[in-house]
Each structure stands twice: as structure tokens, then as C-alpha cells.
From Swiss-Prot:
Homohexamer. The gene is coaD. It is found in: Cytoplasm. NCBIfam families: coaD_prev_kdtB, cyt_tran_rel. HAMAP family: PPAT_bact. This is Phosphopantetheine adenylyltransferase. CDD domains: PPAT. It catalyses: (R)-4'-phosphopantetheine + ATP + H(+) = 3'-dephospho-CoA + diphosphate.
Length: 165
């Protein structure tokens, strides 16, 4: 069985990685699909996010990383799967994700969404929280893979570096 795990992953967190690892243990193949959303202004380019996820999942032989734009169900169809994997941290996530799952089923009734709850020690994590902590110089190495922590340090150091003379 093959599943699709879509998201913007800006940036990838250890919570995302935990879901990828756990999801990969449940299916024959897991496709991590990185959304290119023109309505958002990500901290990291699509290429950077693809590189971060690929580097962070290289130990998983059944995980591939792709990019997509448009509808998740269209991407899943292109990948030859009807199974979409999503993570839940709290009830507020469930309400949002349930709405998206119902929308996906209205577009393609053959699709199923499987929800995995996050591991308790990652339940506080979100990409937004990570960026906020990094923006103010806080340590994020316990929140993100090493490659992401390094990229965040470069991003925020360059964003706040004084102009050269």
C-alpha cells in the first residue's frame, strides 16, 4: 500500500519527521508531498524544503519526496494512491483536518484520510512556533532535524544581519 503525506513543511519539524517515520512503518511506500502554495510566503524555498526533507528521511528506504501545487487529491491520483496521511496534535487540528478530509472525499469519493496522533513530546510543535523561536535566537535543535536547524540559523542571521558597508 502507498500513502501520500502532504504539507508545506516550512520548516520540517521533528513532529513531521516522527509522523513520516511512523507512517512509513505502516505502508509499503510513503510519498512526502511538499506543497508549493503561491498564497503563502515561505521562509524556505521549495528547493530548500525538498532538500531538508530528503536529507532528513534518507534513512527510510520507502520514503520519497516530491513537490506539488494544486489539489492534494490530484497529487495523490498522480502518485497512484488513494490514501492520505495527516497528523493531529490537538482537537483544533482534528476539526480542520476533518473538514479537509470531507472536502477531499467530495472531490474523489474513493480517497481515505488516515490520521495519526503526534507523539506527546512533539504535540507542542508547529512550523510557526519553530520559526518564532528561531527568529528571536532561541535554540531549535530539539524541535527540528539538524539540517533544518542549520538552515534556520543561516536564514535568521542573514535576515537580521546589519547592512555591509
Amino acid at each position: 500500500m502507498k500513502a501520500l503525506y502532504p504539507g508545506s513543511f516550512d520548516p520540517l519539524t521533528l513532529g513531521h519527521l516522527d509522523l513520516i517515520e511512523r507512517g512509513a512503518s505502516l505502508v509499503d511506500e510513503l510519498v512526502v508531498a511538499v506543497l508549493q502554495n503561491p498564497g503563502k510566503s515561505p521562509a524556505f524555498s521549495l528547493e530548500q524544503r525538498l532538500r531538508q526533507i530528503t536529507a532528513s528521511t534518507e534513512h527510510l528506504g520507502n520514503v520519497s519526496v516530491i513537490s506539488f501545487d494544486g489539489l492534494t487529491v490530484a497529487c495523490a491520483k498522480e502518485q497512484g494512491t488513494r490514501l492520505i496521511l495527516r497528523g493531529l496534535r490537538a482537537m483544533s487540528d482534528f476539526e480542520y483536518e476533518l473538514q479537509i478530509a470531507h472536502t477531499n472525499r467530495s472531490l474523489a469519493p474513493e480517497f481515505e484520510t488516515v490520521f495519526l496522533t503526534t507523539s506527546a513530546h512533539y504535540s507542542f510543535l508547529s512550523s510557526s512556533v519553530v520559526k518564532e523561536v528561531a527568529r528571536f535566537g532561541g535554540a531549535v535543535d530539539h524541535m527540528v532535524p539538524r539540517v533544518v536547524a542549520e538552515d534556520l540559523a543561516r536564514f535568521f542571521n542573514s535576515a537580521f544581519a546589519p547592512p555591509s558597508r
